[in-house]
Amino acid sequence: GATILVPILTGLSVSTTLLMAGLGTLLFHFLTKGKVPAFLGSSFAFLGGYGAVAPMVNGAPNKEMLPYACGGVFCAGLVYIVMSALIKGFGVKRVMRFFPPVVTGPIIIAIGLILAPSAIANCKTNWVVALVAVATIIIFNIWGKGMLKIIPIILGVAASYTVAACMGEIDFSAAASRSWIGLPPIQMMKFDVSSILTIMPIALATMMEHIGDITAIGATTKRNYIADPGLHRT
């Protein structure tokens, strides 16, 4: 859901986002030696930064400022690389002392609260589909067995999409009119101090979210991915 919705809200290309999400996930599994069952998608956490640097203009992408927002996200990626090197050099325990659960927990909660208005706004468009998604996720998360318990979000998306299709809420004409093969739009990044300072610090929040996600995945699979393959690899 986020992988599609984030580019729509920011004015980026959905197809390019899906391509980069796939390539990023493959690179992630290469770096983690295929040990961590995770998919890398878009992050809602950067929406605030994007909105501040490149707000939509009458529902259309801000083509003038969007390259600066992309430049800020690029710099946020550099923060990930620096933190990975610090964790590798000083060890997980030394670095994690500065990020105890009392710090990481509220940050993750804050990110969730930031996303709440967007979720409610989307639910208002069709409460039936929204309730089907929520009910499916809750049912499989609580009573699911084996693999079904691990992928409740995917099952919720599949169930709600099926219901939406049966209700005629999905317009397939746009997909039918598109070509099967095409090149992604090429856009060069631009860098500005204000856009970098606005977006780059968000990387600290998403890193806390990442640590929580890796810990949650480890709890589900009963493995310690912080130790093996190591937090710096993830």
Regions found by a protein language model. Give the residues of each.
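Membrane-embedded alpha-helical modules
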Residues: 65-174
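Juxtamembrane helix-boundary/capping and inter-helix hinge elements in multi-pass membrane proteins
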Residues: 9-12, 34, 53-64, 88, ...
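Short, non-helical or kinked segments that cap or interrupt transmembrane helices
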Residues: 12-18, 34-47, 95-104, 148-155
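Hydrophobic alpha-helical segments embedded in the membrane of multi-pass proteins
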Residues: 1, 16-26, 43-47, 78, ...
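Juxtamembrane interface elements at the cytosolic ends of transmembrane helices
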Residues: 1-4, 135-140, 151, 163, ...
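N-terminal signal-anchor module of multipass membrane proteins
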Residues: 1-37, 45-63
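Hydrophobic, membrane-embedded alpha-helices of multi-pass small-molecule transporters
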Residues: 1, 129-133, 151-152, 167, ...
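Membrane-embedded helical hairpins/re-entrant loop segments and their flanking transmembrane helices
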Residues: 11-29, 201-234
